Amino acid sequence: MEQWQILTMQNWRFSFKFKDACKEDIQDHCEPKPKKKEDVIRCLVEAVATDTVEEQKHRISKDCRAQLKFELLQKHSNIKLDPALEAACHDDLQQFCAYDKGEDGGIECLKSQKPKTLKKECRKQLFQEEKEEANDNEVDFTLLRGCKREIKEHCSGEESRNILRCLKDFSVDNNFDQKCLKVLNKRVIQQSQDYRLNPFLKQACSQDVTKYCSDIINEFQNGGNGFEGRVVDCLKQTALKKLPLSESCHKEIILNMVDAAKLVEADPVLERSCPQSLLYCRSVYQTDKDISECLKIMFKKGGLQDGAECERHVAEIVEETGADIHADPVLHSACAVDLRKFCHDVAPGEGRMFACLVSVSKEKSFTLEHECNSVLTKRIEMFGVAVKVIALRKIKD
């Protein structure tokens, strides 16, 4: 059976259902006419993705889209059914995944590697697969298998590209399956590496990226290693500088800040800028929340073990609390009761919740919970240090 599947993946004419469903679509929308099935699929996928993102009428017929989804799901379930990926990543599979191939033959193992460690052609083919899964979560075999129960319970009515985001919304549930959470976190980390793998952010911030981050696009888009978090970091810095971002982009950047606050690896710039400080914090603490808090305390005490770039980035992480309190899980958790009590009528975002807590802490007639007051006091002190670091950096720049 696998041999026949491999044959049909190599030549689209051997895949009879696909041929019947998509023949006219291929003739109408794929010029010059591709011969390899991988090129046919890529052509159709790009057409479907463009129409979905731009919210316009689909050029590809419904029957062809359904068959295309089936073909993609097959391809993503086993590397042997993706000849182009298997060939491009042959050496990397041997080097990194010889003992960790799993049921999919090594696809997830390859995704776990840092982009720079993979050969350029392998990274290129793997990125194509990641894009397909980001634009249509129903072709993400590992996500569907690992989160089957959670998708059925929480996200069965969602559009295919919304499933991952829907799962993220419910992942705070204590009963959330750990196997599913592991896959979910892995996808969040992938998105953080390259903004093009986050279709919502890519769509919402397209004009903002052109306006503020075009130098990064020009420098890194042909490098083969993706953007390594640089585009999102550029947009975060733009937001922290109070420069005008489109409303939809600003919302996406806040969501990204929250992701990075909950999952340290979802901040590739932090990983790259603060390796020694992270090494120390990870040797002492286990959870992402505690590791992040460890970095902030080291920053406040002037004890970060890396250079100025690390100090600058941690200062921005501290400053992000002023942008949205959800970007600081420790403060948000410690002050949950007080936020409901004193700030329930304050609109979230733009530092309003943080400002509300600070205002309440100064009122003699109100008393914050002890833990909230303690964490808030530390944050105010950290914020003062962060403002000085960022101001000094601006002078040097």
Could you say what each language-model-derived stretch is?
Residues 1-397:
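Mature extracellular/luminal domains of secreted and GPI-anchored eukaryotic proteins, especially small
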